[in-house]
A protein has these predicted regions:
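Extended, helix-rich architectural segments
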Residues: 1-152, 156
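A broad, structure-centric signal for solvent-exposed, well-ordered loop/edge residues
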Residues: 46, 66, 81-84, 134, ...
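Intrinsic disorder/low-complexity signature
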Residues: 11, 32, 48, 57-58, ...
């Protein structure tokens, strides 16, 4: 597989990645939000002054409250599931108790899926099964070889393709996702109906780099379908992008964030006015400070204070 295809992005991914990053930073708050630089920059404001203003402005995180309130309401009563003939199956019980091979139950994993869908508008769930040399189901049970699920947020699903079946139903016939990424390389996984391939791509984020794309592993797709489900929060008008619960709240939070900055500026400047003086006038800051001026200083050069009125 050539590097150009492995580093390609779907047009809808390019159109929505900025919003997705804005939503997740708005939900996380703290340094993640501050590092997004969502304060409006003043004209002629230096980078140092802008960074200082960011440090002094608190974040009132409404986005996290919205997502957690919805999640708490939906999961207030645990879901009831009917497994039919599979009820009591050892592999099913193992999956329900540890759905992601990381010790989290199926309910816990699906709660996270719902939260991510609320933040981004949609969330991807991929089902996989470890490769093994076992020949019987008894050996699989003994070694706990079974399917598990992985969660992928929309930033990591970089390319896809839908096709319409003869029945009229749309189905995935290609899915490209980024499993891991750093400054030097990325691990990319390509799903098709025929195979599942894993590649290591050097200099993945450099658009015109000549880094190597090396195949790590390629296994047949035994089910002939891409084992991925797109979980929507609300369906959008373009598949597979959903509508986030934060589509409006995030911008409201940004507005409040900027209002807090303006209030902080107003209070600080009102309480600490600016002193205008000539270079030869000695003055110190602080309450009760003394200003020494030369005896022969002209009257029109005497120090004076600039202070905002605070009336808006």
């Amino acid at each position: 597989m050539d590097r150009k295809f492995l580093t390609s992005k779907h047009p809808l991914w390019n159109a929505n990645i900025a919003n997705w990053e804005f939503y997740i930073r708005s939900y996380l708050g703290g340094n993640d939000y501050k590092n997004g630089y969502y304060l409006h920059r003043y004209i002629l404001e230096s980078p140092e002054e802008y960074d200082q203003r960011i440090r002094h402005t608190p974040v009132d995180n409404h986005c996290k409250n919205v997502v957690q309130i919805y999640t708490s309401f939906l999961w207030r009563v645990p879901p009831t599931r009917d497994y039919g003939s599979l009820d009591g199956d050892p592999q099913l019980e193992s999956f329900i108790n540890d759905a992601d091979l990381d010790g989290r139950s199926f309910n816990t994993v699906m709660r996270e899926v719902q939260m991510n869908a609320s933040i981004y508008g949609n969330c991807w769930v991929v089902v996989d099964k470890p490769q093994t040399n076992t020949k019987t189901r008894a050996e699989e049970l003994q070694q706990d070889i079974r399917p598990y699920i992985s969660i992928y947020t929309p930033e990591n699903i970089v390319n896809w393709n839908y096709r319409r079946a003869t029945s009229g139903r749309f189905y995935l016939d290609m899915l490209l996702l980024v499993e891991d990424i750093n400054a030097d390389r990325a691990i990319v996984k390509l799903f098709t109906e025929e195979s599942i391939a894993t590649y290591e791509v050097e200099d993945y984020e450099k658009e015109y780099a000549d880094g190597e794309a090396r195949l790590i592993e390629e296994v047949p797709n035994p089910i002939g379908r891409i084992p991925a489900v797109n979980v929507y929060n609300l369906r959008g008008n373009k598949r597979p992008v959903g509508i986030s619960d934060l589509a409006d709240v995030a911008f409201l939070q940004q507005s409040i964030y900027n209002d807090y900055s303006e209030k902080e500026q107003l209070i600080r400047l009102a309480n600490h006015p600016s002193l205008v003086k000539t270079p030869n006038v000695e003055a110190s800051a602080g309450a009760g400070s003394i200003i020494e001026i030369p005896e022969d200083l002209q009257s029109d050069l005497k120090p004076y204070i600039i202070q905002p009125s605070g009336q808006n």
